[in-house]
From Swiss-Prot:
<dbReference type="GO" id="GO:0002099">
    <property type="term" value="P:tRNA wobble guanine modification"/>
</dbReference>
<dbReference type="Pfam" id="PF01702">
    <property type="entry name" value="TGT"/>
</dbReference>
<feature type="region of interest" description="RNA binding">
    <location>
        <begin position="246"/>
        <end position="252"/>
    </location>
</feature>
<keyword id="KW-0819">tRNA processing</keyword>
<dbReference type="GO" id="GO:0101030">
    <property type="term" value="P:tRNA-guanine transglycosylation"/>
</dbReference>
<feature type="binding site">
    <location>
        <position position="215"/>
    </location>
    <ligand>
        <name>substrate</name>
    </ligand>
</feature>
<feature type="active site" description="Nucleophile">
    <location>
        <position position="265"/>
    </location>
</feature>
<dbReference type="InterPro" id="IPR004803">
    <property type="entry name" value="TGT"/>
</dbReference>
<dbReference type="InterPro" id="IPR002616">
    <property type="entry name" value="tRNA_ribo_trans-like"/>
</dbReference>
<feature type="active site" description="Proton acceptor">
    <location>
        <position position="92"/>
    </location>
</feature>
<comment type="subunit">
    <text>Homodimer. Within each dimer, one monomer is responsible for RNA recognition and catalysis, while the other monomer binds to the replacement base PreQ1.</text>
</comment>
<dbReference type="GO" id="GO:0008616">
    <property type="term" value="P:queuosine biosynthetic process"/>
</dbReference>
<dbReference type="GO" id="GO:0005829">
    <property type="term" value="C:cytosol"/>
</dbReference>
<dbReference type="InterPro" id="IPR036511">
    <property type="entry name" value="TGT-like_sf"/>
</dbReference>
<keyword id="KW-0479">Metal-binding</keyword>
<comment type="similarity">
    <text>Belongs to the queuine tRNA-ribosyltransferase family.</text>
</comment>
<keyword id="KW-0862">Zinc</keyword>
Length: 367
């Protein structure tokens, strides 16, 4: 029996306003989850994440399993005890990271054998091992182990990949056993609507605490992503959280909420920050461009983050040029605050019954 509870508070069209409750805290949805691959959101402390409004973060099963290993994390009680984040944590299953290894992996019915990116030793990961690792991490939301279908994939390839993921989903559920953490199933099927339907039907049969859409934002054109979202999101169970994995840009988030998605994660705000790409209410600023060298305005006059209240574009340009660590940190604080503020604005618009109006205005002003 899971300790998670989901309340659907309000709907506007397909867009949903909800709340996910855990013993460690509530998550107001739609929600964006900052990614803490190795247990930390790069350059930020748990206090800073809370200040910007994050209520849940994501940890990476694959990377934490390889380093430092679950024995060390278990000595701290859980990943929460290890990294000092006392609110909910979602851990992915490691399936996407294995997919990212490409030719360095060998896939069988049992699981995946691959060379460790740390020391090149031979490593084996299966649904059962993934569930045990996530149990050891003590995460609040556990993702079932799947194979992320590559793009492009023929219909035959997408079908075989999806069917393997469904067999692994069943094994994940069995291995999850009496773990009170929530277990989410992942819909696969590539760019083929009928395969997505088959996948969702099988996952409903197995029965999960929440449902995720996987295999998007893997290199496909934006119109394909929207087509699959249009087809799939509203068919997911109404009474359970809906999670779109690894997406995306601010526009992607607004468009996915419009189609009925509740939860998101993406490395984009933090990774882009380190490369000098800043999200603002009017679009993206590339802070290393020379035009910002003597620009004394803040990154975004509509933002109340620490960076915008205290520093100019000129200073941030200087930090970027001199490769100062502080530059990456200040950019990350801003970008993740921007994402959390966007989710707050979306939730407020849904609360007030004006989300479709908000969406139109946002898509018109955000370049």
């Amino acid at each position: 029996m899971t300790v998670m509870k989901f309340d659907l508070i309000k709907k506007e069209g397909k867009a949903r306003r909800g709340k996910i409750t855990f013993p460690r805290g509530d998550i107001q949805t739609p929600a964006f989850m900052p990614v803490g691959t190795y247990g930390a959101v790069k350059s930020l402390s748990p206090v800073e994440l809370k200040e910007m409004g994050a209520e849940i973060i994501l940890g990476n099963t694959f990377h934490l399993w390889l380093r430092p290993g679950t024995e060390i994390i278990k000595k701290h009680g859980s990943l929460h005890g290890f990294n000092g984040w006392d609110k909910p944590i979602l851990t992915d299953s490691g399936g996407f990271q294995v997919f990212s290894l490409g030719k360095m992996r060998k896939l069988t019915e049992e699981g995946v054998t691959f060379k460790s990116p740390i020391n090149s030793s031979k490593v084996f990961l299966s649904p059962e091992i993934s569930m045990q690792v996530q149990r050891d991490l003590g995460s609040d939301i556990v993702m079932c182990f799947d194979e992320c279908t590559p793009y492009p994939a023929t219909e035959k390839e997408a079908k075989e990949s999806m069917e393997l993921s469904m067999r692994w989903a069943k094994r994940s559920k069995e291995a999850h056993g009496d773990n009170p953490s929530a277990l989410f199933g992942i819909i696969q099927g590539g760019m083929y609507e009928h395969l997505r339907d088959e996948s969702l039907a099988k996952l409903k049969e197995i029965d999960f605490d929440g449902f995720a859409i996987g295999g998007l934002s893997v290199g496909e054109p934006k119109e394909d992503m929207i087509r699959i979202l249009d087809h799939t999101a509203h068919q997911m169970p109404e009474d359970k959280p809906r999670y779109l994995m690894g997406v995306g840009t601010p526009k992607d988030l607004v468009e996915a909420v419009y189609r009925g998605v509740d939860m998101f994660d993406c490395v984009m705000p933090s990774r882009n920050a380190r490369n000098g790409h800043i999200f603002t209410s009017e679009g993206v600023i590339k802070i290393r461009n020379s035009k910002y060298k003597d620009d004394t305005s803040p990154l975004d006059p509509n933002c109340d983050c620490y960076t915008c209240k205290n520093f100019t574009k000129s200073y941030l340009h200087h930090l970027d040029k001199t490769k100062e660590i502080l530059g990456s940190r200040l950019n990350t604080i801003h970008n993740l605050t921007f994402y959390q503020n966007l989710m707050k604005s979306i939730r407020k618009a849904l609360d007030e019954g004006r989300f479709s109006e908000f969406r139109k205005e946002f898509l018109a002003s955000y370049k």
